[in-house]
Amino acid sequence: MTHDGTWSDESDWEAVEFELDEAAHAPPAPVVAVVGRPNVGKSTLVNRILGRREAVVQDVPGVTRDRVSYDALWTGRRFVVQDTGGWEPDAKGLQQLVAEQASVAMRTADAVILVVDALVGATTADEAAARILLRSGKPVFLAANKVDSDKAEADAAMLWSLGLGEPHPISAMHGRGVADLLDEVLAALPEVSEVAPRPGGPRRVALVGKPNVGKSSLLNKLAGDQRSVVHDVAGTTVDPVDSLIELGDRVWRFVDTAGLRRKVGQASGHEFYASVRTHSAIDAAEVVIVLIDASAPLTEQDQRVLSMVIEAGRALVLAFNKWDLVDEDRRELLEREIDRELVQLRWAQRVNISAKTGRAVAKLVPAMETALASWDTRIATGPLNSWLKEVVAATPPPVRGGKQPRILFATQAAARPPTFVLFTTGFLEAGYRRFLERRLREAFGFEGTPIRINVRVREKRGARRR
C-alpha cells in the first residue's frame, strides 16, 4: 500500500473483482416456504431460522408488510426463506386463504414447512393446506409449534392425522427442536433451486398493479386481439401459471397470468394475498410492467407496487392506463404532475395506453426491449474508473466528521440489475450516491433499470492487524 492509502498493485482489486463475480454468477439458492394459519408462529420461526429479528412477529389483524423473502445460512449452506404470513384472519375466509397460501408455496418453493399450533391441534384450514401440499410432490415438513416441554410432545403426536408424516415438535419462540428441523429440511433441498427461472428462452414479463387497474384487459388485448397466444404452460395442478405471447416478432413469457385471469374472492385478507401474488410474479420476471390508472391520482398502493419492483431489482416499464379517459387539454398538465410525483423514477420507461381501446399498447414492446437491454448492461472496469475519476475531480464527496472520504476504485459487480461497488476511505452520504447514480445514467444510459451502488469502506491498517 502506498503512502496515500491506495493499493500499490492491482492484485487486491483483482481478488475482490473475482469474489464479486463469483457471487454474481452463483446459481440460485433453494427456497423454503413457511406456511400456516395466523398466530401459529410462522414469523417467529422465520426469525429463528434467520438468527435475527427481521420478519414481522405479530400475526394479528392489520399486520402486513411487503417483503416476504430473506436470505438465510445454515451449516454453511445458502437458502432463501419465504414468509407467507401477515394477512388478517377471518373465520369465513380462513380456509380459502390458507389453501391459497399453500398453492403459491407449491409454485415458488423447493420445500415447504407447514406450521401448526400443537396446542390447538389440526383445524380444517390445516387439513386443507395439507391436502394441497401432498399433491405438490415437493418435500413438506410439518412443524408442530409451541411445544415447550416434553409433556407437550404428546400434543404434537396428534398431528400425524394430517398425513404429512412425522410432526417435528418445535418451539419457535425458544428455539427448541428448530435445529433438528432445519437439518432435515436442508437434507431434502436441492443444491440449486428448481423453481428459480432458468436463463435463456423467452424474456419473462410480469404485469402488476393495484386491483381493477386493467391488468386482465391489457393481457387480453395483448393476447386476444393479435390471436398470438402460443399456449398456456401448466405450472401446478391448481392452475396454469404462465402465458407465451408473440409480440414484435418475438415470444414473451407473461408470468403468473393465472393470478390475473381469476377473480380473487372477497374473503378477508385477499388484498394481502394479492400482494403475495404480486411479489411472486415480480420475483419470477425479468421486466415488470406496472399498470397505473391515469384517470385517478397516484395512490399509496401504486407506490408500494413500484417499491416492490425496485427492491427486487427488475427492469421497469410504467404503463399509464385509461389515458383515453383523460381530457385532451389536461394531458400535458398530467404529464408534469406524474414527473413531479415520480421524480425518483425518471429513468423508467413510460407509456400512456388504453387497454380497452388498444391505444399505444404496441409501444410497450420497444419499452420492454430498451429496459431489458439496460438491465443486461455491463461496463468494463477501465472506462468505469476513467469516468469516476473525472466526476470525483469535478465534484468530490462531501466532508464527513472533518475528513473527506476518497473513492479509490470502482467495479461493476453484477448486471440484472447493474450493481456497482465503490471502494472508499470513508462513508459516502446517500445524497452523494444519488448524485453518482444520476451521472452514471447520463454517461452510460441505463434507461428502464434500477441501479445499485454499494460502498465498501477500507479498513484501517491498524484494525486489520488486530
From Swiss-Prot:
Keywords: GTP-binding, Nucleotide-binding, Repeat, Ribosome biogenesis. GTP 1 binds at residues 36-43, 83-87, 145-148. GO terms for molecular function: ATP hydrolysis activity; GTP binding; ribosome binding. Residues 30-193, 203-376 form the EngA-type G domain. One of its GO terms (biological process) is ribosome biogenesis. Residues 377-459 form the KH-like domain. It comes from the Bacteria. Associates with the 50S ribosomal subunit. GTPase that plays an essential role in the late steps of ribosome biogenesis. Belongs to the TRAFAC class TrmE-Era-EngA-EngB-Septin-like GTPase superfamily. EngA (Der) GTPase family. This is GTPase Der. It comes from Mycolicibacterium paratuberculosis (strain ATCC BAA-968 / K-10) (Mycobacterium paratuberculosis).
